[in-house]
Amino acid sequence: MRAVRASLVFVALLLAVSACAGDGRPVDLANVTSVERPTPVGAEENPPASSGTSAPAPDCDPKASFRPDGALPPAGQMPPRTTMRAIQDRGQLIAGVDQNTFLFGFRNPTTNALEGFDIDIVRQIAKAIFGDPNKVQFKVVTSAGRIKALQEGDVDVVVRTMTATCERWKDINFSAIYYTAGQRLLVDRGSEVTSLDQLGGQKVCAAKGSTSIKTIAANPAKLIPVQVDNWSDCLIMLQQGQVAAVSTDDTILAGMVAQDPNLTMAGPRFTEEPYGIGIPKANVDMVKFVNGVLVKTINDGTWAKSYDKWLGQTGGSRPAPPTPVYRD
Ligand code: GLU
């Protein structure tokens, strides 16, 4: 009896094998269109409004920073008892940056080095302190992690497409503005959508902790905000058809368009996003120093060179660098 069963199993196996071998075509193909596409880790739909401190942001001019104190000290000779001297003595500037935003802060896949407009700014600060633009320890921070990294003293500066807002000024200081971006919309090429108002009931992606996600959530058309940890997660969700659009700064969206010609920016800018360098609240001396570095970077043509290198490839003409505004 056992022998009969064994030979039946053998015959069944033979039939199964011949089903594949037959005329050379595989059988029983899995229905690949039904495979579920993975959602980026941490993606959240309709997130609760950010907890934050409940007090409203005080009225302020978020673009106004602290005036530099005269000429910059020579590199390698930071004045005693200053934040800059402590950084010089440590031997490295510690900078919070992004590694997922092509053109501003991204990892070059062939060299593994961090590159982009924001990374160039970090190197200018290091050059002013040490005379060497490479004396930097980069720490990758998410949009949502920027303020905490500064408050906990994990980094000396955050240079990460960060909009200076009155709400953020409550917790940290900002340098003068080094770039002015604006929020726009990214959609599939061929889409008719040109504004957030047309996306009622649809999913729109932005990073957690960004000004962009708040603007999406506040739109009266009642969109479904989808928040993720990294901008590259939004790009993937749009490419996989999991969201109808991405909406954030035109700078970040330009980097996505450069990576995927099937996408396009639609409609005009609908916010102003002035970028400042984040600095811990206590380090006003560092803010003044960094503002001196920004003036030098703009005046000696370094800003324009960096703009041409990273944003020149996105078309359009180079804007004038922002004019610094100070509090006094
Ligand atoms: N500039 C916006 C912000 O600071 C969006 C960019 C980002 O989060 O990286 O929130």
What are these regions (language model features)?
Residues 14-19:
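C-terminal motif of bacterial Sec signal peptides marking the signal peptidase cleavage site
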Residues 20-24:
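Bacterial signal peptide processing site
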Residues 32-158:
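Extracytoplasmic small-molecule ligand-binding "clamshell" domains
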Residues 43-78, 210, 277-315:
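Extended ligand-binding regions for polar small-molecule ligands
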Residues 102, 114-129, 162-165, 181-235, ...:
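Bilobed "Venus flytrap"/periplasmic-binding protein-like clamshell domains
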Residues 127, 134-198:
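Acidic, polar ligand-binding/catalytic clefts
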Residues 161-170, 239-272:
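A ligand-binding cleft/hinge motif common to bilobed small-molecule-binding domains
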Residues 179-187, 254-291, 314-328:
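Periplasmic-binding protein-like
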